[in-house]
Structure formats: C-alpha cells, structure tokens
Amino acid sequence: MNSLLNDVQRQKALLEKNLKNFAERFPALERSLRLQAELFPCAAVNRSGEIDNRFDAVDNDSGETDNDFGANDNDFREADNRLKIFEAKNGEITASYKDLLLHSRYNPSSEAAKTLHTEFVTQADSIVFFGSGLGYGQAEAAQSFPSKNLIVIEPDPLHLLQAFCVFDWEAVLKVPSCVFLVGADTQTVISVLEHYGLRDAAVIAPKACTAHAQAYFSALASLIARNKDKQDINEKTLQKFGTLWLSNMCKNLARSMSLNGINRYKDGAPHLPFCILAAGPSLDEILPHLREVKKRAVLVCTDTALRSCLRVGVQPHFILVTDPQYLNARHMADLKAPESILITETAVYPDVFRFKCREIILYSSLFPLGRYIEQFGEKKEPLAAGGSVASSAWDFARFCGAKIIYTAGLDLSYPANKTHARGSTFEEKTHFISHRLKGTEMHNAAAVYTNPAYTNDNKAADYEGNPVITDARMLLYAWWFESKAASFPDVKTASLSAKSLCIPGFFLANVCDLLSLPVREKEIDDFCFFQTAGAENLTDTPSSPRQNEDNKTDALNSLQKDLCELQNTVKQAAEVCGRRCRTEADYTQVLNELSRIDELIYKSRVKALASLVFPPPSQLESIAQKSLPPAPPPPPRGDYKTAAAYNILKSKLIYTIILQSIDTHIHYLKKNGLFL
C-alpha cells in the first residue's frame, strides 16, 4: 500500500509544503486556507479507505481562528466522510466522492494525460478546471502546457486542502500564469474567465470533481454558456453592422465633436429615484400615471418607448438611443421633445442628431474610431451595453448614483401574447400593414411564434411564478440585468409589473409605491438641467466654435498620419511575407523580421481601428481554411521549414485583411471630406 495513505506526519508535511508554495503566489488566499487548516480534520485513511480523523492542525503562528469561507468544523467532517482516498492499481493515490471516481482506480496519471492531450485542449489558450480533484489533471497541464493559463475553480476550500495533503502541487504552482479561485462567487469567476478569454478556454469538468458543489458548478456552466452566446451575438452583430457603424461615425464626426458628455451627471443624484421606460406591453399599465410619476422620479426613456410617452403628453427627462440602424431611427421620426435631453453615441444613424430636443449629449463611443477622436476633445464617460437600449438606460441611472431604479415595460417576454406597448412604433406599424385577411393579432402572433429564437421555456416565469413566453435573445438580456444586480448590490431595482419576466436580483413593486413618494419636481429639474444639483460635475461647459474646429483639425490630422503609418507598416510586413526562403536560416530571418514589424503594429495608436471591420475569430478561421492548405504539425513532430512556411502564409493573409480594413476606414473618411 502507498505509505502516504496511513502516514499522518507525511501528509502533514506535504500539506505544509503545498501551503508554503501557495503562499508565494497567493499570500492572502493562503492565509485564509491556513485558517481553514486549523479546523481541518485528518486526511489520513486506514486500509479500508475510510477517513481517520486523528490529523493535527498544521502549524500556524498567527493565532487567528476566523473562518473566511463561512464553513465550520462539522461541515468539514461531514464532507470528509463522503470523500474516500485509496490506492490505485499502479500504486498512486486515487479517490472517490459519493462512490464517483475522481480519478482512475488503475492509473490516475495516465487518465489525466489522455484527458488533456486532445485537440480541444491543445488549441486553447487557457485550461479551466472545475473542482480541484486531487491534482493529477492540473499537474499534467503544468507539465505539458506550461505556457497556457491554468485556472482552478474550487468553491469548497476543504477539497483543496484534502488534495494538498496527498498530492504535490509544486509543479502547478510554478506555472507562470496560474489562477486559483477558491470560495469565489460565480460572478467573480465569470469576470476572471472573461479577462483570460472564455472563447479560447478549455473547461475540464468531470462529474465526480463537481459533485460536492453541483448547484454551484451548474450555475457557473450556465453563465459560461450564456457568456459564449453573448460573444457569438456580438461577433455576428459586428460582422453585420461594422461597416454601418463606421459609415455613421464618419458622417457624425464633425457634429459630435461639438457636443458635451454625460460626465456632469456622475453620482449627482443618489437621493433621487429613477424610472426606466421600455416599450414592453406592461408599459401601458403606467402610462396613465406617467405625469404624476414624472414629479417623483427621473424618467429615463428608451427611444422605442418615446412615442407612447408623448402620446400621453409626457416628455421624459432623458431619452436613450443606441442602435445605429435606420429602422431604429424611425422610432423618433416626426417626433420632438423640446424639454428632454437626448443621450446617444457617435455611431447612431445621422438623423438622430437632427432630433428636436433640449440638448444632445454623448457617452463614450463603443468603437475604436470614436474613442480615438475623443482623445482630442472632452473625455466622455462610458455606459455599459447589454444588447438592449434598456440596459444602457439602467446603467445611466446607476451612473447618476441612483440607489433605487424602477422599471416599466421591461418585460423581456410576451405577456398576453403582446409584443409592444400601445402607441409604440412597432404597435402602430402592425395597424398600418394589417388588412382583412391578416389582422393585427395575426401579426403579433407571427412575431411571437415565428421568432427564430422562440422558446417555450417552462423555467421562465413572471414575478408571480406564472410561465411566460420569451426567447433566447431576451433571456440573454435578462441575464445581463441579473449580473449587474449582483455586481451593484447597493443599487436596488424594481419591476412595476408582475407580468414581466422575473429577473433574479430585481424585486416587484406597485405603481402605487412610486406614486406614494413625495413630489420632488424642483430637485429633479435642478439635477437634470444642472441648475443647482451636481454643479461640482459641470466641467463640460460648451467649447467655443473655434476650439471645436481646432480639436477637429487636430484629430483628423493625427488620424490621417497614424492610419498612413500603419498602412505602410502592414504593407512592409506583407512584402516580407513574399520573400523566397530556401533554408531554415531564411525562414528564421523572415519570422524575426515579422516579429519586429508586429511590435510596430502593436504600438500603433490606431491598431484597434482595424477591429471594427475585421472578421471575428470564427470567420477568420473559416477564411484561413478556405484560403490556406491544412496546417502542418509543429516541430518536433513536423518539419520546421514546412511549419514556418505555413505561418508566413497565414500571416500574409492576416496582413491583407488588415490592409483592407484600413482602406475601408480611409474610404469612408474621404467620402465625408475628413481625409485629404
């Protein structure tokens, strides 16, 4: 039998060694783990494989007894009794949890190698482990892929301490990019995974290694799937609208440089309630009371709901517009709101900038060209984008310092098979196009049931627990609001309709609750129109026409210079790719030269501009598969010259696409008289 299994002192020494190595990388987390070790029972087992609770606590000179993870000694002992450690057939240590094998009962190391040496893992930039196991998978990853990001997610510190007692984690802790998420909530985990790149991560999630926290890992897997869906949607949106955004920005550039930003409102109204007006069917419930609500809360209206609000004679304090499409601009066609402030972004359809209102202000551009131009004028604050204009409206309320936000019309579903509020552009359009053989109700039913993303998900329910009809797109929006509610717990958000899709983190309120608030009309007007409140943030006073023109000239001159420099640099790289190579030295020289040029491209101030009309990774891979021969195996399995030739060929393809992107920018800038 493996002598470590019944040698308490050796296990104690191994735990101490692992904790010391852990402290070198994660000192704060190690202190928390060491406190857990004070309560940690024995990891030693007897020959039957049962836990033997006679292990002393590891040395701890701190004298602290707090438990940062919120567990207690009884919890640990109960969890330990479900984890059995025993000897594998090859003499290594293995384990089971609730009779599920964490590792092979024959050869744990070989099993880990087979799991990790797959194309899926080899091509990933990061390897993510759900659960610590005993450490065989992590050790194999450290040995075989030391240059990858290694991320270990373990919600229960007990299981990591148990692994530290019976397996040497030194190799894992020596990996340059190694991350341990121990006891972290799912939102924190998602944030870290997004930082390292979820799309390029290989997730290793054996059922046995996640059984001790099944609900946690199930929730995390759902969040990862939603996040990947969001990335897919973003890629497709960029592919579809990238050129439109670029065209709109070039048309709006001169006008936008003379506009102020939302900066003045930052944290200016923590004492005021906000009400977000979206265009869902439940907006009809609040419209009769909207005039009174305006006296008690700051109204932030989406462009889709504006027509309905004006129909009842109420001009909201703020109007949000984010979508760049022409059809979206039609929501505001023939409307005017001289008492309202319009908040938008430089890439919207140009007609938006001709809307008649009190003032148009901007938030920071979502796109590289807009952010580049902003460097030469007033710095503008950003707003989050969750795929829906309502998400930007919510984030604007949070940006203003709101502690309570009410939402009306944020249904994210089809209550009573309705699609939009009465009086909205969508609803009016169905009346306009309906006829005797296809009435309004048939159009609404078609909008619901022929939606490609339609799903009758029984888990989707309103605030009273009744099932609702929704689709995958709106569920993704709901997840965005859920994640923001978790990220900003001090901001309370309420739905004014029980018929809306229930968003975890939101609570249900009645319009009477809002109407029972005191009238604060003067305070609201002072904040919105900056007469008194928020005066400390009024640094964005309008620039003179002369200053605006100077800023515009400086921005365009710098943009032209930087684009031309990048264009010449990329052309030089493409020429280097065309050199003929015969020997390994020739290939090495070309690759070194390309590395030097890549450094210059990376340092360019306009390198990000190419991303707007650059193919997303999935499409780029598809282009490469169609344009290039199959990738040869890398050395030492393959020939160096063959692999180098393929890399040079692929680099040339990428440089060609970058040049096309630069040419597209120059084309639209010239078309609008912004490029000499």
List each model region and its residues.
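Intrinsically disordered, low-complexity terminal tails and inter-domain linkers enriched
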Residues: P41-R82, F527-D554
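Acidic/Gly/His-enriched mid-domain segments of enzyme catalytic cores or analogous surface patches
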Residues: L160, F164-G242, L310-A402, K626, ...
